[in-house]
């Protein structure tokens, strides 16, 4: 996962796709209810009517499964949108915070000091502390992004195999607690 990619992550396209899936699920649900009503409305008796009703009910059941899958995909897309948006915002904010401390984060996530040379040992130690904090936070953001991708892939595979996706815990991410040490903080 490249840092430059994470800077571009946004949730809006995934959020829009979640809405499309939800609309499709509703359309399939409505169609299955209509078909169910028609199957129940068949009148007459005999093997032909019974066979037609059974075939229609089987189709209704398949349509309901399809609607459930579409609802699941909408949920997955919504969770992905939230995660991508959170990660993208955290990466962009942190990239700016690092730049404010004269630390450049490369496209691959590498960290370089681009400011003036330190005038003292304490200044040099502070620069090294800041660089270590930036490197750690870049690693954390990249880790969170990788975990999000793995979770989304796992959930899509679950839906494809007829199962249900894991719901996101909705817990507070570590991303919103990431900050560089304040100016003048001791290296300890």
Question: Language-model features: where?
Answer:
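N-terminal secretion-targeting helices of virulence/extracellular proteins
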Residues: 1-168, 174-180, 185
């Amino acid at each position: 996962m490249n840092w430059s990619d994470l800077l571009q992550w946004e949730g809006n396209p995934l959020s829009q796709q979640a809405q499309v899936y939800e609309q499709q699920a509703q359309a399939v649900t409505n169609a299955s209810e209509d078909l169910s009503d028609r199957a129940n409305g068949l009148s007459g008796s005999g093997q032909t009517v019974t066979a037609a009703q059974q075939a229609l009910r089987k189709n209704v059941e398949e349509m309901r499964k399809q609607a459930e899958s579409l609802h699941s995909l909408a949920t997955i897309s919504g969770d992905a949108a939230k995660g991508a948006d959170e990660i993208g915002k955290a990466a962009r904010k942190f990239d700016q915070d690092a730049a404010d401390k004269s630390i450049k984060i490369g496209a691959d996530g590498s960290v370089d000091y681009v400011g003036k040379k330190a005038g003292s040992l304490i200044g040099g130690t502070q620069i090294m502390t800041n660089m270590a904090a930036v490197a750690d936070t870049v690693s954390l953001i990249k880790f969170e992004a990788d975990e999000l991708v793995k979770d989304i892939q796992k959930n899509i595979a679950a839906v494809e195999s007829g199962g249900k996706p894991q719901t996101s815990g909705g817990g507070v991410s570590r991303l919103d607690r990431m900050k560089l040490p304040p100016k003048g903080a001791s290296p300890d």
